[in-house]
Structure formats: C-alpha cells, structure tokens
Amino acid sequence: FSVNLDGTKEVVRYAKRNGCKLIYSGSSSRHHNPELSPYAMTKHMGEEWIKMERRIFGLRAEIVRFYNVYGPGELVDSHMAAVIGKWRAAIKKGEPIVIYGDGEQRRDFTHIDDIVDGLIRIAESYRTHEDAWELGTGKNYSLNEVADMFGDVKRVYVDDVKGNYRETLRINDDAINRLGWAPKNILKEYIKNL
C-alpha cells in the first residue's frame, strides 16, 4: 500500500509543484474486481487519485495500463517476477515450471520495447485520454499455450492463487492507435530466441 498509494501521492505532489506531465503506470488488473487482490486495489485507488487530481486541480496526467510485460531485464528470481521471467529461471535451473490452477487462464503479454515505445508516444503527445491508455497486444494465450512455446518442459500444476483472474486482454481502444502505436514484438518469437 505504501509504495502504490503513498508513492503515487508523492509523485503527484512533485508533478504539481514542477508543472510537469505525469504518466501513471496503471495495470490491466483494473478491468477486474479490485477487491480480489491487494495489488489490484492499490492500482485502482492510484488511478482514481490521478483522475481526481486531473478533474479538480488540473493535473496534467495520463494513465497507462500494462498487460503482462516481458522482455530483457525482467525479474526472474523474485516474488515480484512475472510468469515469463519465473519460467525462464526455472528452466535455466533444470526445474519444472509451476502453473497455478489448470493453466487455462489467459493473458495478454506485451514486450517491454513495445511498452517503452507507447510510453514515449504518450509522453510526447498533446492528446489526452479521459480514462487510460491501454498498452497490450489485443491477443491472449492460455498459460498452457505459453508453456508449449517453451518446448518440452516439465510442468507442475498447483492450486490457483486467490484473486487470480481468468483473463486479461487489451480492450478495443483505438486511441493508442491514433498515436501510431502498435505492438511489434511477438511472444512466441521472443521465447524461441531465449
């Protein structure tokens, strides 16, 4: 809570004091019931704080939602690591990959280079979004499909985590396309070249 909420308030204060545009890192978890996860709740509250600051105090701010970011530099051996990083680390150690639940939950995966490209376009643009910019591919895969992309790896299925949602998929929002943004990186190619 302190990082996502207190940290957001501090960044807002800084942006207001210095008159700079704020780009807030939201999350695709915003499209699900925020009461199912402390993380989702704090991201939801952060977005609402930013919107309130825009509406009442004229804060120049844009909210950007990310979808399962992967790529070079990602965390691999941390409780904060995303699934691609965790699986890379497990495979490198010769360990099985861990799949929570049945593996049929679907995720929209977005490469870090595409995220950075989108963030730069949003930061440099005069355009605003009344809600949030969505940086995702618009295509999702089941975790079993992603595991297949890694080839013949041992899998261990464990009980699903409470609050784990069944699907993420970038909503059909053409606003980001008007900035000339489109994802260029393909998950399967990235995994093949690891």
Feature map (PLM): residue ranges:
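Active-site loop of short-chain dehydrogenase/reductase
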Residues: 15-23, 58-60, 96, 102, ...
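C-terminal substrate-binding subdomain of Rossmann-fold SDR/epimerase-dehydratase oxidoreductases
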Residues: 91-194
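Conserved cofactor-binding/catalytic machinery of classical short-chain dehydrogenase/reductase
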Residues: 7-10, 21, 45-46, 111-114
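Alpha-helical structural signal in soluble globular domains
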Residues: 10, 14-17, 49-53, 145, ...
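NAD(P)-dependent short-chain dehydrogenase/reductase
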Residues: 38-40, 44, 48-106, 112-121, ...
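Structural signature of the Rossmann-like NAD(P)-dependent dehydrogenase/reductase core
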Residues: 21-26, 62-68, 108, 134
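Conserved Rossmann-fold NAD(P)-dependent oxidoreductase catalytic core, especially the SDR/UDP-sugar
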Residues: 2, 6-40, 62
